[in-house]
Amino acid sequence: MALNLEKKQEIIKAFATKENDTGSCEVQVALLNERIKLLTEHLKANPKDHSSRLGLLKLVAQRRNLLKYIKRTAHARYVVLIEKLGIKDR
């Protein structure tokens, strides 16, 4: 269910703004996006898992808030990020 270390490091490397960057908004959004994908697949197989559904909703809200922050502070970075992740602009 959780991201394995190799996948996580791959995502961090792809979205880091500088070397050893693990906490920037872009990296956080990319990691959340991957966790959301994994949880979505889990919920397709287990539709009655309501605690996981609640966790998914929390992750989506967290990603949405981070995306709003990036859009407000650095719109160019926001556009690049949503294109890379394949997320729709709201």
UniProtKB/Swiss-Prot annotation:
One of the primary rRNA binding proteins, it binds directly to 16S rRNA where it helps nucleate assembly of the platform of the 30S subunit by binding and bridging several RNA helices of the 16S rRNA. Forms an intersubunit bridge (bridge B4) with the 23S rRNA of the 50S subunit in the ribosome. One of its GO terms (cellular component) is cytosolic small ribosomal subunit. Belongs to the universal ribosomal protein uS15 family. GO terms for biological process: translation. The lineage of its organism: Bacteria, Pseudomonadati, Campylobacterota, Epsilonproteobacteria, Campylobacterales. PANTHER family: RIBOSOMAL PROTEIN S15, BACTERIAL AND ORGANELLAR, SMALL RIBOSOMAL SUBUNIT PROTEIN US15M. It comes from Helicobacter pylori (strain G27). Part of the 30S ribosomal subunit. Forms a bridge to the 50S subunit in the 70S ribosome, contacting the 23S rRNA. The keyword rRNA-binding applies. One of its GO terms (molecular function) is rRNA binding. This is Small ribosomal subunit protein uS15.
